[in-house]
């Protein structure tokens, strides 16, 4: 069994929207995750994630830490195994996009930018999830995933399904992701995201992403929303890496963009 411990964070942030002598505060939060991994055959993997933290508080929630109220919880259980030439997974409290390839090399603490604009198409947060992927061996990969919040694929359940295709070259990659997620028994949202990255020699890598969502059941003037992302990453800056990014997430048509 292998064990991996990740995460701790602190943020300084203004908690009050007004501008006065009492609007500044220092906030500290913590978050950690223990990943337990084991294999029965050498080709499969049983993964269990244990989380704790208070990082869901206002002011630091953007850092996407664990906000379980200082309680240790089982965040997810999944099992990945080969079937023929494909890879299959099933999980509880897992993401239907677990086997997807998103063409983005940027990584950062911000929840808004870390998704690289693939916010809704790469389905996440399902109670029950399953998926499969296939690697053609020439840079092309395809994957599919599903997730549900109640009974599996029944008329009463709210299900989500998604498809992903990607190509990874020597120093670049592109991916396309599509999803259809039921928001009620009669309506569904459909999302399409395209991502790409390029890593030139001696220069920072470039990652871009764009997603558009058709909101089922909404009025025609507000039935679309979009996410946009662009980021640069320097791989070797001292002992680590450095990244800068700009973008916005889930902006409904007709609304002003709120860049981060």
Stretches with model-predicted labels:
Residues 57-58, 98-100, 152-153, 184-186, ...:
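Extracytoplasmic/secreted cell-surface and envelope-processing proteins
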Residues 1-5, 10-12:
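Short, small-residue-biased leader/transition segments that mark boundaries at the very start
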Residues 13-20:
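Short glycine/proline- and aromatic-enriched beta-strand/turn motifs that initiate or cap beta-hairpins
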Residues 156-259:
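Detector for outer-membrane/organellar transmembrane beta-barrel domains
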Residues 20-148, 166-168, 234-235, 239-243, ...:
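Outer membrane beta-barrel
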């Amino acid at each position: 069994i292998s064990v991996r411990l990740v995460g701790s964070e602190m943020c300084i942030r203004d908690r009050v929207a007004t501008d006065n002598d009492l609007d500044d505060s220092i906030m500290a939060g913590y978050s950690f995750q223990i990943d337990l991994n084991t294999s029965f055959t050498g080709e499969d993997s049983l993964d269990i994630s244990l989380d704790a933290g208070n990082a869901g508080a206002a002011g630091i929630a953007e850092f996407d830490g664990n906000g379980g109220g200082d309680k240790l919880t089982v965040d997810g259980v999944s099992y990945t195994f080969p079937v023929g030439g494909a890879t299959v997974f099933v999980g509880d409290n897992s993401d239907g996009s677990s086997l997807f390839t998103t063409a983005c090399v940027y990584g950062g603490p911000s929840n808004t930018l870390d998704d690289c604009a693939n916010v809704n198409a790469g389905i996440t947060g399902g109670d029950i999830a399953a998926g499969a992927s296939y690697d053609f061996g020439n840079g092309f990969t395809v994957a599919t995933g599903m997730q549900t919040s109640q009974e599996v694929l029944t008329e009463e359940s709210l299900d989500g399904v998604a498809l992903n295709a990607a190509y990874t070259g020597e120093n670049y990659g592109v991916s396309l992701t599509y999803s259809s997620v039921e928001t009620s028994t009669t309506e569904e949202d459909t999302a399409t995201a395209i991502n790409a990255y390029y890593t030139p020699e001696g220069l920072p890598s470039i990652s871009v992403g764009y997603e558009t969502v058709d909101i089922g059941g909404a009025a025609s003037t507000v039935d679309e929303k979009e996410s946009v992302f662009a980021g640069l990453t320097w791989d070797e800056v001292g002992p680590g890496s450095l990244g800068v990014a700009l973008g916005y997430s889930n902006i409904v048509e007709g609304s002003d963009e709120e860049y981060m």
